[in-house]
């Protein structure tokens, strides 16, 4: 889902974050710029990022408000925005985030399961440009598929947990 979304809108990077209690944690991260620099077998360093769900950071803002954000330049946010761009992830990964579209992953009841974040749309010359309205529609379409995948994963996980719990109650003498 993330790969196809990025391909359709021609974005360099992206992530899927999942809500875990009061935090939002990156589950899938892709970055074509960094992928080219990795040695064989080496993985991207994004799996360690986790943020509190609040309106101070972009992912937390989208997860807490349920509103998508289309940001032209993360380093040039107006002073009056309630959220800020966390430069630490760029510093830690030696990357330069500019344009970003962040979309909430909501189920049918409106519960936020996670966030889809697409980063650095590229033009035909490889320059970073802003995401447009058409990109927003495409990303929203793929977000629906991401929600379905997350819901399926949650249901499967819950079913396995129930089966394990039921197995604990089984009397081994009965078999």
Question: Which ranges hold each PLM region?
Answer:
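A short, aliphatic-rich beta-strand micro-motif
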Residues: 98-107, 114
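GAF sensory/regulatory domain recognition
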Residues: 3, 14-55, 76-77
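Histidine- and acidic-residue-rich, metal-dependent catalytic cores
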Residues: 159-175
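Amphipathic alpha-helical regulatory segments at dimerization interfaces
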Residues: 2-8, 61, 65, 90-91, ...
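Signal-transmission/dimerization alpha-helices at domain junctions
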Residues: 61-68, 115, 137-156, 169
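Signal-transducing coupling segments at domain and membrane junctions
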Residues: 58, 67-68, 72-99, 121-129
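Short amphipathic alpha-helical segments
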Residues: 2-7, 13, 59, 160-164
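Regulatory loop-to-helix N-cap segments in sensory/regulatory domains
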Residues: 96, 111-113, 119-142, 149
């Amino acid at each position: 889902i993330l790969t196809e979304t990025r391909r359709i809108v021609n974005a360099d990077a992206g992530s899927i974050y999942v809500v875990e209690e009061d935090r939002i944690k990156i589950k899938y991260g892709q970055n074509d710029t960094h992928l080219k620099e990795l040695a064989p077998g080496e993985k991207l360093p994004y799996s360690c990022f986790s943020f509190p769900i609040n309106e101070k950071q972009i992912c937390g803002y989208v997860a807490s408000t349920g509103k998508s954000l289309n940001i032209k330049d993360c380093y040039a946010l107006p002073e009056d925005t309630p959220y800020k761009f966390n430069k630490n992830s760029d510093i830690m990964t030696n990357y330069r985030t500019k344009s970003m579209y962040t979309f909430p992953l909501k189920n049918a009841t409106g519960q936020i399961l996670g966030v889809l974040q697409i980063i650095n749309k590229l033009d035909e010359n490889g320059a970073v440009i802003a995401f447009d309205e058409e990109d927003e529609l495409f990303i929203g379409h793929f977000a629906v598929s991401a929600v379905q995948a997350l819901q399926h994963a949650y249901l499967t996980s819950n079913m396995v947990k129930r089966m394990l719990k039921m197995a604990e109650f089984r009397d081994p003498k009965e078999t």
